[in-house]
Amino acid sequence: MEYYRGVDIHPSLDKNKNSIYKTGEWLIKIEFPKQYPYKSPSVGFLTKIYHPNVDYNSGTICLNVLNKSWTPIYNLVHIYNIFLPQFLMYPNADDPLNIDAAELFLNNIEEFNNKVLLDIKKYC
């Protein structure tokens, strides 16, 4: 498996949308399997991020298109310009890796937003 040591990204979030993540920048890792593009790359955050679909300790992400729906027509442009921005715009609390974040997202959005902003300030 080839390993690319990280990419500094600032997802292209529509500034007209009110995403709590729009001010953050994260270092991510991408691992390409030998079967790429027929098998999806593994994508994870190296920078801490408080998100229902990211394991807070490992940075592993739960994103259906990378785990189940990947096809060879997708590439890194899709990941950076579509999948990750949508992932940050629309957290899915129904399929969490971070249960604490998912519960706050569903039950106390103000506290959830505060935790996101604290992590952005601390780590980004």
Language model features by range: what are they?
Residues M1-W26:
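N-terminal onset of structured domains
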Residues K29-P41:
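Proline-anchored loop/turn motifs at beta-strand termini and strand-loop-strand connectors
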Residues N18-K22, Q35-P37, N53:
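Short glycine/serine/proline-enriched coil/turn segments at secondary-structure junctions
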